[in-house]
Amino acid sequence: TNIACGTARLGLKSAVITGVGEEHMGRFIREQLQREGVNTDGVKTDPDRLTALVLLGIRDQEQFPLIFYRENCADMGLTVEDIDPEFIRRARAVVATGTHLSHPQVEAATIKALELARANGQQTALDIDYRPNLWGVAGHGDGESRFVESDAVTAKLQSTLHLFDLIVGTEEEFHIAGGSTDTIEALRAVRTVSKATLVCKRGAAGAAAFTGDVPDSLDDGEAGPGFPIEVFNVLGAGDGFMSGLLKGWLEGEDWPTALKYANACGAFAVSRHGCTPAYPRWEELQFFFERGITRPDLRNDAELEQVHWATNRAGNWSSVRTFAFDHRLQLEEMEGYTLEKGGAFKELCLEAALKVQNGQ
């Protein structure tokens, strides 16, 4: 959902295939997606499962513990029957997350969507997004963990990598996909099973793209400029990065430009609090590129924040009309005032307001 919202903010037409519960959290997610301009035709309401949830903790500037509530959740309940070929046909690209390859049922749905896309000649992308505890190789208390070796996870990922035109991950995520803790070896292992462009995220060092053979150094890949900002909260940075990358990739930009978009969107995410709420719209991103960084803590950049909130207001509120009839001392000072008369007056005000609201 973060990527769907992030790409929509950047001007792409996005949709999401997922599941939510038949409860307030599920309704909130559906409504918020719609507010962001995301097509929700593929969002399934599951009456038997709850919407997935994650709790974020902020321990200090470097540690952000997570607790995932995702066992038998609504989005993991997707089946092949939930994948509509016509809905897939309308897309320009299909983006999958590695977590949805971790369970046979939702994996089958994901593979169906990818195979339909490839049969249609559409682009496909994978965000490896490796969470060891969601693959069952780490405990519930290890939500912050980003890497645990697992031959089974590596084999599962490698069995699907041929389905993608673009594969994106951190060094640790390519370690699990490639089956090696040496990043170059891991990338080369991925290359043996996939012709996809490989984009390796390197944190503060930016990212590198490899369209062909993997060289001896990550520094020899295609790169875009990085942005030196203060890290405030890393949650959602990967989805922000992916949103910017997809904007450039799908609109035919070269890799340095696409990576520039990606690095900037990731920088916005880590220097603000939250995921989707931190992501920029296209106008804000252009303003950021033209003006540059004036302070590393972007959330405290008043000029940038003004652009952010001005371009992310929900709704088109041309005017607000307020009718206040709460108590005022001036009422008590009127000749002949009593509490009973004051109460009756307020009831008349309420009745009039309700009639106006109902168009009477």
Language-model segments: which ranges?
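Conserved phosphate-binding/catalytic region of the ribokinase-like
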Residues: 115-119, 179-303
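Alpha-helix C-terminal capping segments
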Residues: 2-13, 56-58, 248-250
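Alpha/beta catalytic barrel-like cores
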Residues: 295-360
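Short, conserved phosphate/pyrophosphate- and ester-handling motifs at nucleotide-, phospho-/glycolipid
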Residues: 7, 170, 238
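Conserved N-terminal subdomain of the carbohydrate kinase-like
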Residues: 13-98, 286-295
